[in-house]
Amino acid sequence: MKKVLIIALAFLAFAGSNSFAQNEGMNMDQQMKIWMEYMTPGPMHEMMAKHVGTWKMVSRMWMDPNAEPQVSEGTVDAEMILGGRYLKMVAKFPAMGMQTEGWSLEAFDNGKKEFINIWIDNMGTGVAISTGKYDEATKSIIYHGKMYDPVAGKDTDYKSVSRMISDNEMIFEMFSNYDGKEIKMMEINYTR
């Protein structure tokens, strides 16, 4: 434990001295103000908090764009964590003949002014990571990301759109490229 504490303190000392060296023109109060703004949840975090609760989900997945979708139903439990800074969603639903559990962690980075989403589930060992911006006109968060496709043996690009329809209804859509065209791979409707 003592060794871990020493390593952590050494890291903080290095990171802090590096940060201070880059900002020699700022006094400590100015730097603290910037850090406080960075760490304080704001309007985008309040928007994420509207997802908190238990949701019923109906998922449609297209394995082939010319075929009928596979439909499944499940539940999602959503909560804000770490002082209202992050949205954690745990989804449970059947997919491809097995019970699936997936976790989504959504953040809004005050510094970069962008959303970040991380998805993991028991259907693989990889992590899907995407970043996005809020589109005021469509009231949607539009993400672009990468995930590993084990069949292709490489990362593939995807786009997803998350939109609150009302306080008790939201929709998530995921798109991929197929023969040079954007096609819908998944649509999930959430209600509570």
Where are these regions (language model features)?
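Hydrophobic small-molecule pocket/channel-lining residues, especially in calycin-type beta-barrels
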Residues: 22-192
